[in-house]
């Protein structure tokens, strides 16, 4: 999978969970952050400074690690992509 595919997978899972639990604000927060990461991956000219403030990984662990491991894994992978992109490093995911 490409870095963009990891972000798209996380976005799809978040959208699916948001439909099942409408009104759960955490999904809106995650969607906004994932869309920003996606935009940065698609347009290298965008400001990357906000990538250092991404909280996708901590939300994954706090909110979903125990209750929804599939979503938690996708969010952790997306967080890794964001961090590595923000640092300008190569992204190595399985």
Regions found by a protein language model. Name each.
Residues 1-31, 82, 86:
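Short terminal alpha-helical segments
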Residues 15-62:
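Amphipathic alpha-helical interaction modules
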Residues 14, 31, 35, 39, ...:
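A ubiquitous, low-specificity "background" feature that marks scattered single residues
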Residues 53-94:
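Amphipathic alpha-helical binding modules
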Residues 5, 12, 20-22, 42, ...:
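Compositionally biased amphipathic helical and low-complexity segments enriched in hydrophobic
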């Amino acid at each position: 999978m490409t870095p963009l595919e990891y972000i798209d997978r996380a976005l799809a899972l978040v959208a699916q969970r948001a439909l099942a639990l409408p009104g759960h604000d955490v999904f809106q927060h995650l969607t906004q952050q994932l869309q920003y990461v996606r935009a940065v991956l698609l347009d290298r000219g965008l400001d990357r400074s906000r990538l250092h403030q991404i909280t996708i990984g901590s939300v994954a662990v706090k909110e979903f690690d125990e209750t929804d491991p599939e979503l938690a894994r996708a969010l952790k992978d997306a967080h890794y992509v964001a961090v590595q992109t923000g640092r300008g490093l190569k992204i190595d995911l399985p």
